[in-house]
Amino acid sequence: VDHDGDERWTLRVRIPADTEIKDCEGTREGMFLLFTPPAGHWETEWEFLARPRLIKRPRELYALLYGALLFALPIEGRKEKREYISDGVERKFPYCDYEIFPDSAWEYAFVRECDFEVIECAYEAAFDRDRPPLKIKTKLAPIDWGWEEGHRWVAAVCPKGERSGKDEEKSLQPYGSTTLRMTELPMIEKGEK
């Protein structure tokens, strides 16, 4: 900043929610104030930092945020086309319905006090399902989630949460970079099955 006058002025920088700012004076949150010298050339440099964090959701579940981005565990799935006639309206491809079924494990819990590793990836499209721009690697514990009573393909609203195996290293990706996903997971203590 080049400043000619004799007056000092204050530059206010609002630090976005879910981030902090790092400069030569340390790390801060909220509002960042810079006081300029009376005149002359003035430079400053700072860096915005976001850290992965778990937020509590209803029903004792948690979601992973990184800055303003919500992350989810991607689930492999298969689509089955449903063509039918209802109330005289024919639903044929491409105007039919689809059911999506999981082809990979989805019953997991966050492991208390596990680290999160943010991985920046090369990408061509911001919400690419196969090559998302960011991934967060962490340990998840396989659990017995259970099904809604009377439904074979509807996950229980409140998981049982009982550990069913050893912790596994998994990568979560931005919510918008997934089709079939688990976004809210319970928390489980570190340990072995």
Please state what every model-predicted region is.
Residues E43-K193:
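C-terminal beta-rich recognition modules with glycine/proline-rich loops and embedded aromatic residues
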Residues V13, T27-E29, L73-I75:
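Short amphipathic beta-strand/extended segments with alternating polar/hydrophobic composition
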Residues W9-L11, P38-F48:
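Short, well-structured beta-strand segments within conserved domains
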